[in-house]
Amino acid sequence: MVAGAIEDTPREPDLTAARPGSSIRDTRGDRIFNAVNYVVLSIYLLIVLYPLVYIISASFSSPAAVTSGLVRLWPVDPTAIAYETIFKDPAIVRGFLNSIFYATVGTALNVTLTLLAAYPLSRKDLHGRGAIMVFFFFTTLFSGGLIPTYLVVRDLGLLNTRWALIVPAALSVWNVIITRTYFQSTIPDELHDAATIDGANDFRFLRDVVLPLSGPIIAVNALFYAVGHWNAYFDALIYLNDESLYPLQLVLRQILVQNQTNLKMTGDIQSMLARENLADLLKYALIVVATVPLLLVYPFVQKHFVKGALIGSLKG
């Protein structure tokens, strides 16, 4: 009787046979939804990827092919004449080195100041942190203006120096807010209490506990600041007169303007057409030269970027 009762007991359906690695069977609607997602995302990928492929292909094509519109996907009459023309100018190498300096030194200073500002503001026992945050946030609503900022930079003795592109943009309030929110969401008060009992002060706690746990938000800040420094153009145009201090973006602008000026001064029609074709080709090569360094850096911080950006901006 017992055996019969056990056999008559209804059994739960075996859902593990639905599909490997899942206990939930996809419905027809789920499959349609997934298919539509794949199609839409694939189309979006092609829309985003094609301009990049086209620019790279055009930069390696012949000037005549680019001007005639023969380049579609792959290089036509492959040549590296555009890159040879660019890197013959020593100003390009100097601009690269200057941009690397601005990006590395500036980013290191930016991240350091951001962490030192965000950590105290994340502590509930900081007296007056609400008023401090009001002052921080006020600067995001009202700026000092172009001319007053220029006068401040001049009076500080930073004009026409490398620090003119680093010190005025040493801190981003938005990044401070994101970092503060990250600390509040991921660093529990109990961890600070335990470190205090062990005799650690705030600086030691920040160095030995907070920083090792803050890899994602540090990567987010570093990427934001590095991209800003690498693309710096307007500040350099205002504060720098010495061409040896120009960042890459300003050097590339000079090359384009110089080619256009030389083109207008050319008297021979055939020479003018040749230089016009080369000028069009240089535009694509210059885009590649200015963009590739950032594309090479991003994959190394991508895994931290998504986590840090989401936690820092959504929680808290």
What are these language model-derived features?
Residues 2-316:
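A hydrophobic, multi-pass inner-membrane permease signature
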